[in-house]
Curated annotation (Swiss-Prot):
It comes from Homo sapiens. This is T cell receptor alpha variable 8-4. Alpha-beta TR is a heterodimer composed of an alpha and beta chain; disulfide-linked. The alpha-beta TR is associated with the transmembrane signaling CD3 coreceptor proteins to form the TR-CD3 (TcR or TCR). The assembly of alpha-beta TR heterodimers with CD3 occurs in the endoplasmic reticulum where a single alpha-beta TR heterodimer associates with one CD3D-CD3E heterodimer, one CD3G-CD3E heterodimer and one CD247 homodimer forming a stable octameric structure. CD3D-CD3E and CD3G-CD3E heterodimers preferentially associate with TR alpha and TR beta chains, respectively. V region of the variable domain of T cell receptor (TR) alpha chain that participates in the antigen recognition. Alpha-beta T cell receptors are antigen specific receptors which are essential to the immune response and are present on the cell surface of T lymphocytes. Recognize peptide-major histocompatibility (MH) (pMH) complexes that are displayed by antigen presenting cells (APC), a prerequisite for efficient T cell adaptive immunity against pathogens. Glycans are attached at N43.
Length: 113
């Protein structure tokens, strides 16, 4: 069983009081069996078209960009087999990986800009 830490974050960005954006990650700890599907949930709120990001922080390392959505295809493929699907109607950008590996044990962060 590997443990994926998903810090519960609510990040709010405001520019000049006219654009408010936030992300919410559900669940603070996610345990996944090796070989099982990984699903990390991220919902966002934005008054403008969002740019969405997933970052990972492995033990004793800095943040690393996994993938980003900037307005192209709704399914975004990232590094190490991770992908996320932008769903505007559900205001979601959930991170998935078909098969978890022990090396995936880390902290994952969703962000909006």
């Amino acid at each position: 069983m590997l443990l994926l830490l998903v810090p519960v974050l609510e990040v709010i960005f405001t520019l000049g009081g006219t654009r408010a954006q936030s992300v919410t990650q559900l669940g603070s700890h996610v345990s996944v069996s090796e070989g099982a599907l990984v699903l990390l949930r991220c919902n966002y709120s934005s008054s403008v078209p969002p740019y969405l990001f997933w970052y990972v922080q492995y033990p004793n390392q800095g943040l690393q960009l996994l993938l980003k959505y900037t307005s192209a295809a709704t399914l975004v493929k990232g590094i190490n087999g991770f992908e996320a699907e932008f769903k505007k109607s559900e205001t979601s950008f959930h991170l998935t990986k078909p098969s978890a590996h022990m090396s995936d044990a880390a902290e994952y962060f969703c962000a909006v800009s």
